[in-house]
Amino acid sequence: MATAMAEDTSFEGDQLASMTTDDIGRASRLLANEIRILKEESQRTNLDLESVKEKIKENQEKIKLNKQLPYLVGNIVEILEMSPEDDAEEDGANIDLDSQRKGKCVVLKTSTRQTIFLPVVGLVDPDTLKPGDLVGVNKDSYLILDTLPSEYDSRVKAMEVDEKPTEDYNDIGGLEKQIQELVEAIVLPMTHKEQFEKLGIRPPKGVLLYGPPGTGKTLMARACAAQTNATFLKLAGPQLVQMFIGDGAKLVRDAFLLAKEKSPCIIFIDEIDAIGTKRFDSEVSGDREVQRTMLELLNQLDGFSSDDRIKVIAATNRADILDPALMRSGRLDRKIEFPHPTEEARGRILQIHSRKMNVNADVNFEELARSTDDFNGAQLKAVCVEAGMLALRRDATEVNHEDFNEGIIQVQAKKKASLNYYA
């Protein structure tokens, strides 16, 4: 309206010269009236602006007051879609505002064991909520003030390896075939997923490493974790055997939930034979609880909630006692055997463990490898340590061939001849 008046009261120079004194006075009064109206509009707008600023400040103070810690912790039970009631209200009748609301409402269960229906969700967008979410609510109004991180068992959080392992495939001797199989099953699906999609195949979900003790199964898993940027969760089989019913299964479930949140993720289960033994009829409650823990593991491996971004590496010394359901395809698809090292592999392992030692040039690793028949990787490392200790005992500056020979004799003396590691 003010623009239209400006157009009406604008005069050209020639037109102004031809106007009489009365016309000019009338035009000036119109302009003065327009200026007065614009000033009144400006004052009214400024007052409205101040009022809105005051309301915003007041609401921010209320939010700040309501968001004071501590919160009451609650769980989202259900999210409902509300539509206003269509019943016609009579004139002058009281109107239930809650029944006229439109949008999402929430059923909430608090830590005080109360179940609350919230027609107004609170300060959190209801579209971002889902059943099972942990939220912080006001202890008086129960309005949702903030979302909280997912709750996991503290024992599961401790399983996450924060520091990246420093091992490399170069630290493993004589297991080139096993390294290739593990890389194909675990590393490539994470680093070159498009190659599998191009071929139209699904990579293995899990890998079972089995063989005698000391042959490098755990070392291989750590080297695999170091080659990927994936989160690494390390579980031990005996860790999952708990006293209370359902506790072990909850640990497995929480471990896979944490892995899904931090995906891509590698879960390494060492000594899986502690929970994965063949099922049998037993009246002992402890045996049944171990079997329930294994059933939860089977469900997580290929159940409805399985995730291809989670890879499982399991290691055991006794693959022969594992349950067939755990070994079938679709769960632990690839089985990689770790045998005792060959003569060539033993020489390579001795070189790896002695590469940082000050070794004399006359040390013949091929001869040492021939002298260490039936030694595993851990025992070959012990030979190198014993050789270094013998050199230290005689105040030598370097380790010679005789020290290694004496180290072999000492490690051999500690071996139990009747011990059968792997049946």
Swiss-Prot record:
Pfam families: AAA, AAA_lid_3, Prot_ATP_ID_OB_C. ATP binds at residues 211-218. The 26S proteasome is involved in the ATP-dependent degradation of ubiquitinated proteins. The regulatory (or ATPase) complex confers ATP dependency and substrate specificity to the 26S complex. The modification Phosphoserine is found at residue 18. InterPro entries: 26S_Proteasome_ATPase (IPR050221), AAA+_ATPase (IPR003593), AAA_lid_3 (IPR041569), ATPase_AAA_core (IPR003959), ATPase_AAA_CS (IPR003960), NA-bd_OB-fold (IPR012340), P-loop_NTPase (IPR027417), Prot_ATP_ID_OB_2nd (IPR032501). This is 26S proteasome regulatory subunit 6A homolog B. One of its GO terms (biological process) is regulation of transcription by RNA polymerase II. Component of the 19S regulatory particle (RP/PA700) base subcomplex of the 26S proteasome. The 26S proteasome is composed of a core protease (CP), known as the 20S proteasome, capped at one or both ends by the 19S regulatory particle (RP/PA700). The RP/PA700 complex is composed of at least 17 different subunits in two subcomplexes, the base and the lid, which form the portions proximal and distal to the 20S proteolytic core, respectively. PROSITE patterns: AAA (PS00674). Keywords: ATP-binding, Cytoplasm, Isopeptide bond, Nucleotide-binding, Nucleus, Phosphoprotein, Proteasome, Ubl conjugation. Its main location: cytoplasm. One of its GO terms (molecular function) is ATP hydrolysis activity. Belongs to the AAA ATPase family. There is a cross-link at residues 234, 278, 415 (Glycyl lysine isopeptide (Lys-Gly) (interchain with G-Cter in ubiquitin)). It is found in: Cytoplasm; Nucleus. GO terms for cellular component: cytosol; extracellular region; nucleus; proteasome complex; protein-containing complex.
